UniProtKB/Swiss-Prot annotation:
Example of a GO biological process term: translation
Cellular component, GO annotation: cytosolic small ribosomal subunit
Protein name as it appears in the record: Small ribosomal subunit protein uS15
CDD domains documented for this protein: Ribosomal_S15p_S13e (cd00353)
Organism of this sequence: Azorhizobium caulinodans (strain ATCC 43989 / DSM 5975 / JCM 20966 / LMG 6465 / NBRC 14845 / NCIMB 13405 / ORS 571)
NCBIfam families for this protein: S15_bact (TIGR00952)
Key words of the record: Ribonucleoprotein, Ribosomal protein, RNA-binding, rRNA-binding
Family to which the UniProt record says this protein belongs: Belongs to the universal ribosomal protein uS15 family.
Function: One of the primary rRNA binding proteins, it binds directly to 16S rRNA where it helps nucleate assembly of the platform of the 30S subunit by binding and bridging several RNA helices of the 16S rRNA. Forms an intersubunit bridge (bridge B4) with the 23S rRNA of the 50S subunit in the ribosome.
SUPFAM superfamilies on file: S15/NS1 RNA-binding domain (SSF47060)
MF annotations from Gene Ontology: rRNA binding; structural constituent of ribosome
Quaternary structure annotation from Swiss-Prot or TrEMBL: Part of the 30S ribosomal subunit. Forms a bridge to the 50S subunit in the 70S ribosome, contacting the 23S rRNA.
HAMAP family according to UniProt: Ribosomal_uS15_B
Keyword Ribosomal protein: yes
Length: 89
C-alpha cells in the first residue's frame, strides 16, 4: 500500500524544481496520487476494508486541497500538473 523510497525519489526528481524539493505542491500531489492509485488497486481485491477506505478518502481530500491551492496561486502550473498526472479536471 505504501510506496517505496526509490519510487518516492523518482517522483521527487520528476516533479520537483530541484533535487531535494519535497515541499512543492507538485511533488506532494504526485506522491499522494501514487498512494491513491496503490490503495485503489488494493480495494479491487479487498473491497470490505473500510478502515483503509477512510484513509483513502483523507488522501483524496488532501490532494484536492493542494490542487485548489495550486490553482489559486498559479493556474499555469496547475494545468501542467493535472495534464502530466492524467487527472480529470
Amino acid at each position: 500500500m505504501s510506496i517505496t523510497p526509490e519510487r518516492k525519489q523518482a517522483l521527487i526528481s520528476e516533479y520537483g524544481a530541484k533535487a531535494g524539493d519535497t515541499g512543492s505542491p507538485e511533488v506532494q500531489v504526485a506522491i499522494l496520487s501514487e498512494r491513491i492509485s496503490n490503495l485503489t488497486e488494493h480495494f479491487k481485491s479487498h473491497n470490505k476494508d473500510n478502515h483503509s477506505r477512510r484513509g483513502l478518502l483523507k488522501l483524496v481530500s488532501q490532494r484536492r486541497s493542494l490542487l485548489d491551492y495550486l490553482k489559486k496561486k498559479d493556474e499555469g502550473r496547475y494545468k501542467t500538473l493535472i495534464g502530466r498526472l492524467g487527472l480529470r479536471r
